Amino acid sequence: MIYRTRTYIAADWTGDKDAVNQLTMWNEGKKWGLSFGDAHELSSCRSDDTNNCNIKKNCSQNLDHSKYFVLIVGDKTKDTRAGYCMYCKAYNTCSYTYKTNKSFIEFECKYAVNNNLPIIVLYNSNKVDKSKCIDSVVNVAKAHVAMNDNYNNWDYLSVKAAFDMLGK
C-alpha cells in the first residue's frame, strides 16, 4: 500500500525556478507556517541525459506518493516542450510502449488529474492569467492564485491560503 503524504510541485524549472525556490524557502523556514513533504525528495524528475521515459516514470512514482499537486505557471509554462518523446535522444530506438508526446509538465498535470489529486495553481506573477495554465488542470484546480502582490513582492499569505484549500 502506498501512503500519499507528499506534495508534488510541477513547474518550468528553467523559467520559474525562483518561484519553486521561494516555496522551498517558505517550507523550510521556521518563521512560516507553510509545511509540506516535497515529493521530489523521493526521486529525481529533472531533465538530464536520462531517457525522457525514465524521467516520466520517476515523476509518476513521485506522484503516486503525493497527496496534493501544485502547478506553478509562468510566462512560458504552456509552451514548454521539455520531455516530448520526439526530442529524446533515444526516440528512434526507444522500446518503451508508453511513448507520449506530452511535455513533462503536461504529463504531470494529466497524471494528477487522472489520479484525482487536489490541485492548486500558483502564478509566478502578480495576476492570475488562466490562458497560461495547462489545459488539463485549468478547470479542476481548487484555486488559482498569484504568487506576487501588486508591488512584485512574494505574497506568502495568498499562497498559504491556497495551500490551506488543498486539505478541504
Task: Cite the ranges covered by each PLM segment.
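Short catalytic/ligand-binding loop motif for oxyanion handling, primarily in non-cytosolic enzymes
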Residues: D16-A19, K78-A82, V128-I134
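Secondary-structure junction/capping motif
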Residues: F36-D38, T100-F104, C133
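Proline-rich low-complexity regions
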Residues: G37, P118-V121, I134-D135
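Conserved beta-strand-loop-alpha-helix hinge of the TIR/SEFIR fold
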Residues: N62-K110, N115-N126
